[in-house]
């Protein structure tokens, strides 16, 4: 057994904090059987054709680092601290990952790999071996309260595109439901059609909802994904207080990352619902009347919504409820669905790899013969649409909210 009781400083950097890893995680490092299932399903490994991006490689590297820093192993084996060059090479493999969780899904011994990668990124930040762009993420969020360093007062500007929007612009003092828009949908034109569609559906269905507007801050997922969990608390406190002031009993999210952050890292003060689940309930209650559409679609399960939150059925039920819409499943679907390349801050860290992963996803979708890829994530829509448009792929990408809005009678 490995003695992890003492973890010493790394070179000239700050001490490596052993509190970054739970006891469970340290034990799980010893449980790996080297089966390589993780490498077989990893979108980064398959797109880059680099075995060093696999979970297996990362785990072996982490074990060697921790063992080399522990007194017993250091004395017996003469283990040395990694050089700066070695640290730089290893660190790059850690950030060239979408945090899709597919490795965890197939692990035969049940290692919680996604949690381990988050802890590892936190460790890299604490020890000073993080990617340069990590500090940009931190600074953008500190200064602008959104990851893109945009003016937070413009967070609800997309409301201008809502058909017949009320004078209050969905900014009410009180409401039963808060719609938490998310940074991607608030600021990226390719994704802004999603909140527009959802707002029009909610309005047509008679839902009493409000936005937070400029009082909505980033949910904090980019911080968590970058290893910056230490900076998360102000965002959680602010967003909770903003929702409290609205008196809402329920919060809905079209962004799976926001949805999962609120479910796992926020105190449960209101009911947390993803937009696909909320739409399903509206359909079941007969509040969303559909007109027929002659359309063949395939469905892409977002990583955080599918593998992360286990929401698989709701979006499919909504799709199947629309007359004339035919759903053709991807070869790899539900918990086995392949990432689109948009997660884990990868687009910022390695845009070329992110694009190559998106290419593979688009190619897989084209093989189904579908005219449209439907998903339930604004970042997935943006990532796949960007690749499809740049490369003139003959397929459209649409969020579940956009599909429902397209079929809405009103």
Model regions and ranges:
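Short, charged low-complexity linear segments at domain edges
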Residues: 3-24, 58-88, 313-324, 345-348, ...
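Active-site glycine-rich loop that binds ribose-phosphate moieties when present
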Residues: 234-238, 278-285
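Cofactor-cradling patches in redox/metallo enzymes
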Residues: 110, 185-274, 304-321, 326-410
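Iron-sulfur-cluster electron-transfer modules
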Residues: 20-29, 59, 63-254, 259-266
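Cysteine-cluster motifs in flexible loop/terminal segments that predominantly coordinate metals
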Residues: 35-38, 100-103, 303, 341-343
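Long, charged N-terminal interaction/targeting segments
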Residues: 9-51
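Hydrophobic alpha-helical positions that pack around
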Residues: 299
């Amino acid at each position: 057994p490995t003695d992890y009781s003492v973890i010493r400083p790394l070179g000239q950097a700050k001490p490596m904090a052993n509190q970054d890893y739970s006891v469970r995680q340290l034990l799980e490092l010893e449980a790996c059987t080297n089966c390589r299932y993780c490498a077989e399903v990893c979108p980064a490994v398959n797109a880059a054709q680099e075995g060093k991006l696999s979970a297996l490689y990362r785990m072996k590297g982490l074990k060697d680092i921790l063992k080399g820093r522990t007194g017993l192993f250091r004395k017996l084996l003469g283990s040395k601290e990694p050089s700066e060059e070695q640290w730089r090479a290893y660190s790059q493999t850690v950030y060239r990952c979408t945090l899709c969780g597919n490795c965890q899904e197939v692990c035969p011994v049940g290692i919680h790999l996604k949690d381990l990668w988050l802890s590892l990124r936190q460790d890299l930040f604490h020890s000073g071996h993080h990617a340069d762009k990590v500090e940009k993420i931190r600074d953008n969020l500190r200064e602008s309260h959104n990851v893109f360093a945009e003016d937070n007062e413009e967070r609800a500007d997309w409301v201008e595109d809502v058909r017949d929007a009320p004078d209050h612009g969905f900014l009410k003092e009180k409401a039963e439901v808060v719609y938490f828009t998310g940074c991607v949908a608030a600021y990226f034109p390719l994704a802004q059609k999603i909140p527009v569609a959802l707002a029009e559906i909610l309005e047509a269905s008679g839902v009493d909802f409000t936005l937070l507007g400029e009082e909505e801050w980033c949910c904090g997922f980019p911080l968590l994904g970058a290893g910056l969990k230490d900076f998360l608390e102000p965002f959680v406190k602010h967003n909770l207080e903003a929702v409290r002031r609205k008196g809402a009993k329920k919060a809905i999210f079209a962004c799976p990352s926001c949805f999962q952050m609120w479910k796992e890292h926020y105190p449960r003060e209101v009911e947390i619902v993803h937009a696909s689940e909320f739409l399903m309930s509206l359909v079941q209650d007969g509040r969303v009347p559909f007109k027929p559409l002659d359309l063949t679609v395939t469905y892409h399960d977002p990583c955080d919504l599918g593998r992360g939150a286990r929401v698989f059925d709701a979006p499919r039920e909504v799709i199947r409820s629309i007359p004339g819409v035919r759903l053709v499943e991807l070869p790899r679907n539900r918990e086995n669905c392949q990432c689109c390349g948009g997660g884990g801050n990868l687009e910022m860290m390695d845009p070329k790899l992110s694009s190559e992963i998106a290419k593979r996803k688009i190619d897989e979708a084209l093989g189904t013969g579908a005219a449209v890829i439907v998903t339930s994530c604004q970042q997935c829509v943006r990532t796949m649409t960007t690749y499809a448009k740049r490369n003139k792929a003959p397929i459209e990408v649409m969020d579940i909210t956009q599909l429902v809005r397209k079929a809405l009678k009103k």
